[in-house]
């Protein structure tokens, strides 16, 4: 009888939990707002995002390991905070839409004659080697973050916008290299009811690419405001329904700069890594039309089978694909230190990625609730 009551209660809680997509939308919209400028390094966007997440954790009522949720660290990063201009063949281009500046670039204020090297590459040839400017035509513009500088400026142009041969390019922008940008991870938890010294850990990075000049910023709805919203929703669930194990929620910065926040944390853990029973890293959770991918599935086969069995029974997602070990997100450093871990992301749907089009308005959240339910049931079987 007690078992039946437990099952009924468990699924009632899951159904109640499933109603909170409104909260998910609110979180994603805030994280993608112009106020936070892509959660990067212009106007301290990433730390403004940390302040917002910390307030949410406090409102939910999550515990701290110390006086605050914050774990501070720093790293170098290149930024473009001021206005920029790129004119090609006399046509003024729009930042983010028509062009990207290499994130490693130094200040440039010059006009260049362009010479075609091949079908997708042009160079400015003023006698210097290497050439001071390279222009690359791309089918899609995909931005990133740089922690170092380059002597050659690369400008990427959207290929479909330039059917004719390039002749001239007028480029104006300023960089500011910050050698010691202060950033933070956020760490919180819900105490376990039976084995509080053992932890189930959820992680997600909250940083993104920030801004490129004054006219372009990268909202990062799918990458990874979606994952942050899942962690906050799971935090709300476990605060009301504690597990027998403690549940920790870690929000990393510096992921887009090279998994820097998670690396720092893995080398300076707030609680012993040996206490982690399992870690699930979540990123790109805004779609799911084609199911989910589980990185490390071939490493931790027993846990993967548990996850797969749940989905085979409940049909939460179309399919669960498996990959082996990969250094493609914040789970990596934990795997390297012997912590059993998965990295889960959704597949299919929108194609916006590391560009100005990854926005809250078009993020479908196709299998958002189903993935959350799958995670809750998976944790219950660990």
Language model segments and positions:
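N-terminal capping segment at the start of a domain
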Residues: 20-48, 60, 65, 69-70, ...
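Active-site metal-coordination/substrate-binding segment of hydrolases
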Residues: 93-120, 126-130, 197, 203-230, ...
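Metal-dependent peptidase/peptidase-like ectodomains
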Residues: 242-243, 252-352
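Second-shell loop/turn segments in exported
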Residues: 34-44, 59, 71-74, 174-176, ...
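Bacterial Sec-dependent N-terminal signal peptides
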Residues: 1-22
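Soluble metallo-hydrolase cores and metallopeptidase-like ectodomains found primarily
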Residues: 106-109, 137-219, 236, 244
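His/Asp/Glu-rich mid-to-C-terminal helical/loop segments that flank catalytic regions of hydrolases
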Residues: 236, 351-382
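Noncatalytic luminal/extracellular "stalk/propeptide" segments of secretory-pathway proteins
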Residues: 37-128
């Amino acid at each position: 009888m007690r078992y039946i009551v437990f099952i009924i209660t468990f699924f009632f809680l899951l159904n109640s939990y499933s109603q909170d997509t409104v909260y998910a939308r609110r979180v994603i919209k805030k994280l993608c707002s112009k106020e936070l400028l892509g959660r990067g390094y212009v106007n301290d966007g990433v730390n403004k995002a940390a302040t917002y997440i910390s307030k949410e954790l406090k409102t939910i009522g999550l515990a701290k390991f110390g006086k605050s949720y914050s774990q501070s660290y720093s790293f170098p990063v290149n930024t473009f905070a001021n206005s920029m201009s790129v004119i090609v063949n006399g046509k003024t281009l729009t930042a983010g839409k028509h062009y990207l500046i290499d994130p490693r670039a130094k200040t440039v204020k010059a006009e260049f004659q362009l010479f075609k090297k091949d079908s997708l590459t042009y160079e400015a040839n003023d006698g210097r080697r290497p050439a001071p400017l390279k222009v690359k035509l791309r089918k899609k513009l995909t931005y990133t973050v740089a922690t170092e500088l380059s002597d050659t400026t690369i400008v990427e142009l959207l290929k479909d916008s330039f059917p004719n041969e390039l002749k001239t390019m007028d480029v104006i922008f300023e960089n500011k290299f910050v050698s010691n940008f202060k950033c933070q991870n956020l760490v919180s938890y819900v105490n376990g009811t039976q084995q509080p010294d053992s932890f189930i850990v959820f992680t997600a990075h909250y940083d993104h690419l920030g801004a490129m000049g004054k006219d372009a910023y990268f909202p990062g709805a799918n990458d990874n405001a979606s994952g942050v919203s899942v962690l906050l929703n799971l935090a709300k669930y476990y605060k009301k329904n504690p597990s027998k194990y403690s549940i920790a929620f870690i929000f990393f910065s510096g992921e887009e700069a090279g998994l820097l926040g998670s690396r720092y944390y893995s080398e300076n853990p707030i609680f012993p890594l040996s206490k982690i029973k399992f870690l699930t890293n979540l990123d790109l959770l805004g779609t799911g039309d084609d199911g989910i991918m589980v990185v490390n599935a071939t490493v931790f086969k027993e846990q993967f089978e548990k996850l797969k069995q749940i989905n085979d029974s409940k049909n939460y997602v179309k399919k669960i694909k498996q990959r082996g070990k990969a250094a493609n997100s914040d789970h990596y450093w934990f795997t390297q230190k012997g912590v059993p871990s998965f990295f889960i992301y959704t597949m299919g749907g929108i194609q916006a990625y590391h560009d100005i089009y990854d926005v809250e308005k078009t993020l479908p959240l196709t299998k958002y609730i189903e993935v959350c339910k799958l995670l809750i049931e998976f944790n219950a079987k660990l």
